[in-house]
Amino acid sequence: MCDDEEEEEATPLVCDNGSGLVKAGFAGDDAPRAVFPSIVGRPRHQGVMVGMGQKDAYVGDEAQSKRGILTLKYPVEHGIVTNWDDMEKIWHHTFYNELRIAPEENPCLLTEAPLNPKANREKMTQIMFETFNSPAMYVCIQAVLCLYASGRTTGIVLDSGDGVSHTVPIYEGYALPHAILRLDLAGRELTNYLMKIMTDRGYSFVTTAEREIVRDIKEKLGYVALDFEQEMLTAATSTSLEKSYELPDGQVITIGNERFRCAEALFQPSFLGMESAGVHETVYNSIMKCDIDVRKDLYANNVLSGGTTMFPGIGDRMQKEMVSLAPSTMKIKIIAPPERKYSCWIGGSILASLSTFAAMWIKKSEYDEAGPAIVHRKCF
């Protein structure tokens, strides 16, 4: 912090509100200071012990650790905030408990999914200025930030988080809105699917707390097969793919072909009973909606981002699928940076610390004058 006359601005905050995880921290840092689940938990049972300081709601990791006695709710579904009261609790927790700052002193950069309803943006703006008294704020599209983080200005981003996946072609820093495609198939659907196929195997996972166990199994043991049919044969004929997992109560379960059947749903949504195209076809369709002159650059810059792209083997599989879809002479490159789980946040951190960005913030005075609709004018 420099305390010069012209530089009394506080460090901007960057808050990436995902459907599954909140990533929050300070602009200029290379990783988010706070990462916790976007969960609000409310007790399912009557409190009997007085004076324990039981709360009526728990947020994030605390909700996660007490999940056995709570009903867990995610206020963000498919990238869209569905419960604003809970969302406010999450932001409050972020500012006061995790980052320990006063939101009325620091400008705040928020992120949102592309093709989100306009009302969603306005409500975010309103809460920031009216509830938290932000001095300034900005709303940015997640995928654009991911590209910033990878150091490119042109490319197509496949951003797949917990609630929503989308493909966003960006050329020379401009998102091409007509070619953005959205797929409501992401980490949460994969977790639900894994719950279902584990149940077929005879293990029962039903409650919201058990879903978190399955999510952990998915993250620790899941992977993407290069050739699904071949992998299924291998799994059927040998035990080389089997792994064991210890449940919280000490019971050990074995998981075999479920390890790659789960992530396969990204490429074959029909597994989930969805009629949409897989992620590889969605990327291809998105590229084909762009002008013919920019396609070559997009094929050569396929950037993966978001937690659901963390499955081992996804880059190779993506390469293979894209090669079979694209024209035969086309050079195809899949970029999967190791920090892609947080690349959206990192991009926000880069953007908010640029000196040229200072003019972009929506200031409180502007909000007071124009109301929530200002967000559509100022934030592209």
Curated annotation (Swiss-Prot):
Catalysed reactions, semicolon-separated: ATP + H2O = ADP + phosphate + H(+)
Stored InterPro entries: Actin (IPR004000), Actin/actin-like_CS (IPR020902), Actin_CS (IPR004001), ATPase_NBD (IPR043129)
Keywords: Acetylation, ATP-binding, Cytoplasm, Cytoskeleton, Hydrolase, Muscle protein, Nucleotide-binding
EC number(s) reported in the record: 3.6.4.-
Subcellular location: Cytoplasm, Cytoskeleton
Group of enzyme by EC: hydrolase
Stored PROSITE patterns: ACTINS_1 (PS00406), ACTINS_2 (PS00432), ACTINS_ACT_LIKE (PS01132)
Keyword DNA repair included in the entry's annotation: no
Residues with the N-acetylaspartate modification: D3
A GO molecular function held by the record: ATP binding
SMART domains: ACTIN
Pfam family, one: Actin
Gene3D superfamilies according to UniProt: 3.30.420.40, Actin, Chain A, domain 4 (3.90.640.10)
Pro-piece positions: 1-2
Record-level GO cellular component terms: cytoplasm; cytoskeleton
Record's function text: Actins are highly conserved proteins that are involved in various types of cell motility and are ubiquitously expressed in all eukaryotic cells.
Family in the record: Belongs to the actin family.
PANTHER family: ACTIN
Name used for this protein in its record: Actin, muscle
Lineage, broadest ranks: Eukaryota, Metazoa, Chordata, Cephalochordata, Leptocardii
